[in-house]
UniProtKB/Swiss-Prot annotation:
Residues 49-62 have a biased composition (Polar residues). Residues 40-100, 164-259 are annotated as: Disordered. The gene is MIC60. It comes from the Eukaryota. Residues 87-97 have a biased composition (Pro residues). Component of the mitochondrial contact site and cristae organizing system (MICOS) complex. It is a single-pass membrane protein. This is MICOS complex subunit MIC60.
Amino acid sequence: MLRTSLRSVRVLGGRPSVAAAARQWPVAASRRAALVGQRHYAVDKKPESASSPSLPNTQSVASDKIHETTIDDVGETKAATVDAPKTTPPPPPPPPAPKKKGFFRRLRNFVFTLFVLGAVGFAGGVWYSCFSDNFHDFFTGYVPFGEQAVLYLEEMEYKKRFPNSATNAKSRDADGAVRIPAQSGASWRVADGTRRSSAGPVPAKQEEPKAEAPKPKAAEPKPTAKVVEKPAPTPAPAPTPRSESGFKAPEVNEPSRYPPLKPIDLLSLDDAREPVIQDLVHMVNDLILVINADGAHGRYGSSVNKAKNEITKVGGKLKGMKEQFEKKAAGQVRDKIDEFDKAATDLIDRVESAMITQESQWRHEFEEEMKKVRENYEDRVKVLLERERKLNEEKLQNQLLEQALALKKEFVKDVENQVEQERESRLGKLTALSSAVADLEKLTTGWNEVLDTNLQTQQLHVAVEAVRASLEDDHHPRPFIRELVALREIASDDPVVNAAIASVNPTAYQRGISTSSQLIDRFRRVANEVRKASLLPDEAGVASHASSWVLSHVMFKKQGLAEGNDVESVLTRTQTYLEEGDLDSAAREMNGLEGWAKTLSKDWLGEVRKVLEVQQALDVIATEARLQSLRVD
């Protein structure tokens, strides 16, 4: 009746005879064989007031001396502790002088420190592997025994979080034994409603409470435990208490007996697939097992049945909600699938059209690129063919030279061999042959010199003609430094050509010279000014200048090669020589003028002199080239 009856009784220093609620049946069954010969007695505590037992859902006031226990406290007891007397410790002795550590001690300390650090590092790595995936992969892959340690830690964590998992249930079914309680015989005790303990194989004896009037005695069942070994392939049977059908009513001359109460059936939900419902079912079943084991099913039966009904209702509601959610989710998934199918069809159409467009564009670009590649390839082939042709020609020429040298060497070798063989008889022929070869070499050398001279002469002619062409083609004066440099490079060793080039005024080839048409145009302008100046006296005024300008336009001009030394005659002859291309005679005529006429024509004479110097130098160079060609002939 008292709550203290739920507490197990054990000898000080021994093990508890009742296991915890979550593991009561397997552990209790495994210890049954060791407890067959022992009897344990509950603590004799008399109730202070005869108060009726109260259900868990009602409020009751218990004694302060009685410790209230719960289902979690079942199977757990606290050993008595003895307080040791407190004594004042003696003062510590003075520390001994430090000794110098030996090599082996330092080695031992080093190894121990290394071992401790390694163990701490290994444990830290195992612990950190549970939080970091990257470190988990590194630790299990590269550290020895790291994977086994991490798996062991994860398994222990899983067992700690889910103690009633299926694996533990299978192990309990495989290792546990089945207890079959039995009730038989009669007891001399008076039926007092005390608890029928199932903690041990034999119930503990209790003293009969004192009463003024005698009470009828009732037979108290004496449960006995039998250890039944179950076969390996079959699961362990559940405890089967006796049913009411096995109860036999007492006879008239026998003391009264009450039928035993039916134990509470375990809760079972076939369609309970939710983890929460399964956990609730396991919890309720553990509670029912504890209540049945303590014989308190008469008091807690209605509450347990109510809890079972509530759990069944909750399971039904969860199942209905799950079905409703599944239907709703199926509808949403169906709508999403249709929407995705439509979107996928549209996307496929767009992708196909884009692919067709892209394919046509790529085909066009490919054709253009192939055309460019073909053209580049053809150009490259042409360049390569031309290069190969030149290389082949050079190789052929080199081969011919090598062959000529080889033939010459062979010839010389043959000659030497022949000379060695016929030295005495053909020494004269060898000398003649050597002289003939020397003559041929001299002749070949002479012809080479002739060819070089002819080539130099031709190049000299070409350079002179290039200078003349550059002077005659341009409408404006242009420098001809490059032509003169080329001409000097060709005739670098000829003193006549060098002297002719040196006689040319540097201003002429740096700025260029005027052409014949330019000289004639400039002469006409100069002639007008000279005519005006020829009509003026030495000390002329404004009127004289005006009259000379008028008379210069009114005077009749002469034609041809006019005779006389007057200014008009000289100008007429000069113009005639210019039109005929005789710059030398024209310059000589203009150089014969005096006074203002000569002063006005001084610049023109300078230009004509430059042209004549250049022409004279070119004539000298051309004459020298002809002379060299005649010398060669």
